Amino acid sequence: MNLVAELLCLLAFLTPLTCDRVYVHPFNLFSFNKSNCEELESLVPEGKKTFVPASIESQTTPAYENDLNKDQVEAASHSGQGQQALRYVKDFVHILGARFYSALREARQGQNLLLSPTSLYGSLVSFYLGASNQTAADLQGLLGFVPPSGDPDCISRVFGQEVFSSLRMIENLVKSRDEELQFSKMLCLFSAPGVPLSQLFVQDLLPSADALYARAVDFSNPSEAAKQINTFMEAKSKGQSKCLLTDVDPSADLLFAVDVCLAVNVKQVSRLKEAQEFWVDSNTKVMVPMLSFTGTFNYKTDASGTFSVVEVPISKTLLLVLLQPINDSDVESELPLQSLAWLQQLSPRKIRLTLPELTIEGSSDLQELLANMELPTLLGKGANLSRISDANLTVGKVINKAFFKLIGDGTDQPEDPTAQKEDVVFLDVTLNKQFLLAVFEEKTRAMLFLGRVTNPLHGL
């Protein structure tokens, strides 16, 4: 797989080595000994236990869902090896997230765009847990973890659980110290009527979300199936997830959907009294509500004068990175998002930042993204997903929906926003035209969201 080689080369670039530091191949951080393999083999009978999900039309909550969502997942270990594994995972999350973004941006020119790299990566891990043989090996390679020996051995289940543990650690850090934000993640499995699902597979997905649901849907009527799924997910998300699907594949046996939402009410940030101009393109402007941030933030302008970057803390655990083109340059075509260079060498500056209030969401089908990356068969009809079901599954859409909202807790503009000490000069940075954004967990620098804002009013 060319992509695998590219991922490993990029990881080598992202991971500087020093003479007093021993390099550990990322796969070794998730490897295990013979006794672990034997323990896995002993679980094979359990792994063959299946259940048939209740109908999506059922008005009562099935017992298996109560059991699943009562099962609390322990916090991930913060051991040295766990921290090192987390660093590798977050680098691969960044690389694949940038690849997925590149696959989407051309198809959605002129539109707001948002995806969650951690959520998309977690979806691939989910299918890896359900895959066998060559499909498992291909997914492992795409995820960036290729054993040095070339022999995957019996790694699938333990490897997937360890990666989920790292991803969950990141999400727990987001929520750990912040009352001013709301962060939630929901996973739904929709199977055709009568299709059995592996109990062990579904249980293994528990660390990947705050809530997990499995229901049966009749896909033979695509419009009705889409309507039922939309209604179900809107109800379970308390109105947050809307219009997830417009249609479904009537030949599908399984549809996978993840919905991740982040809403932040930034402290000590004011909303300007008057709406401000935002240029959708060179000829079109709209009036939008704006927020005003003042403080010392990390900032840089790239050497070629193509773009500027500012990094702003928006909570105790989150960083918002904003990237704006200079002189109407096409940043997306020139910026190597897969490299971390655009996030490096920022310097503290006194800045007065003005940017729109944001309510932005995006939905992507992992199947389409893989096809755009020339991997259309990875989860196609020939995929071996025998650990999900003993039926011969046809996977339909693999939906990942992301939602991000940014508001300020202040209602008024500061009385005198130009008042400054005589010896302090503030740099004015105003985002009043198309810009890119990324949201990172502050401690690990893991990328939670990546997106583009072309019109802040879309989504309000």
Residue positions per predicted region:
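Terminal peptide-recognition signature
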Residues: 123, 404, 445
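Flexible loop/turn segments at secondary-structure boundaries
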Residues: 329-330, 362, 412-413, 446-447, ...
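Internal alpha/beta scaffold segment
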Residues: 327-346
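Extended intrinsically disordered, low-complexity coil regions enriched in Ser, Thr, Gly, Ala
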Residues: 134-144, 330-333, 456-459
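Extended hydrophobic
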Residues: 256, 308-323, 422-460
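Extracellular, intrinsically disordered low-complexity regions of secreted proteins
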Residues: 33-37, 331-334, 416-417
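Detector for small/aliphatic-rich hydrophobic stretches
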Residues: 2-218, 412
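Non-catalytic, conformational "gating/processing" segments within enzyme and secreted inhibitor domains
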Residues: 47-60, 64, 110-111, 146-326, ...
